[in-house]
Amino acid sequence: MRILCTNDDGIHAPGLKIVEDIARALSDDVWVVAPELDQSGVSHSLSLNDPLRLREVGPRHFAVRGTPTDCVIMGARHILADKAPDLVLSGVNRGRNVAEDVVYSGTIAGALEGTILGLPSFALSQEFTLETRNAPLWDTAKAHGPEILRKAIKAGVPKNTVININFPACAPDEVAGVQVTRQGKRNQGFLRVDERHDGRGNPYFWIGFERVAVVDMPAEGTDLAALAAKYISVTPLRLDRTDEAFSATLAKTLG
C-alpha cells in the first residue's frame, strides 16, 4: 500500500514525523509531501497566482512552497504520477480540529483534496491543553492511530467521505476508548481581532483565539464531547455540504 502524508504545520513540524510513523506501521511505501512553511488555517486554498516550488529534503520527502491542497496535488499528480497513492494521511496537527475548526483547517483540507482525487483520506489531530501546549502528547496519536486506521480502512471509506480523527490530550493509557461522532458546535465565537500599532503609529491586526469559559457542556455525540471525556473522536465528513432538510422548504418559498 502506497501512502502519501502531508500536513499544514510544515515540513519540519513534529506532528509530521508522528503521522509518518503511523503510516510506516501500515506500509513501507510511505511518501511525505508537506508545505515548506506553516500553513495553519489556510483551509482548502489552492495556489493559482504563484508558481509552486518543489524541494527534495530527503529520500521520499518533499517540501512544497504552497498549501496542503497544493501538496496533495503535487504528490498524487506529479511526484507519484507513475503509481498513485492508495491512501492519504494529513497531520498529525498540533491542536484539535473539531466543530468550526473543520472549515478553517488546512489539515482537514489536505485530506479532503485526497478524497476529491478519489483516494481514501484521513485527517489526524492531537489535542493539547494549556499545560501541554508546548509539548503535545504525540504518543497518544502514535499509539492509537495505526489500529484505528486499519479498522476504518477495512470498513471501507465511502467515496466523497473523509475521516477526521482527533486524539484527546491525555496519555495513551488514559484514553477512554473510541467514539464515532458528529461535528460539534461551540456555544459562542472564539476568534478575536487584536489591533496594534507599528513604530510609525500605523495600525496592524492579528486574528487570535479567545480563551472563553465553557457556558454549556458540549452536545452528546459530538467531537467536542468525546474529547472532553478523553475519547478518540472519529468523524466522517462529506464533501457534499447540501442541506437536504432545508432544500424542500427553500424550493417552496422560491416557487
Swiss-Prot record:
Keywords: Cytoplasm, Hydrolase, Metal-binding, Nucleotide-binding. One of its GO terms (cellular component) is cytoplasm. Its cofactor is a divalent metal cation. It catalyses: a ribonucleoside 5'-phosphate + H2O = a ribonucleoside + phosphate. SUPFAM superfamilies: SurE-like. Signal peptide: none annotated. This is 5'-nucleotidase SurE. It comes from Rhodopseudomonas palustris (strain HaA2). The gene is surE.
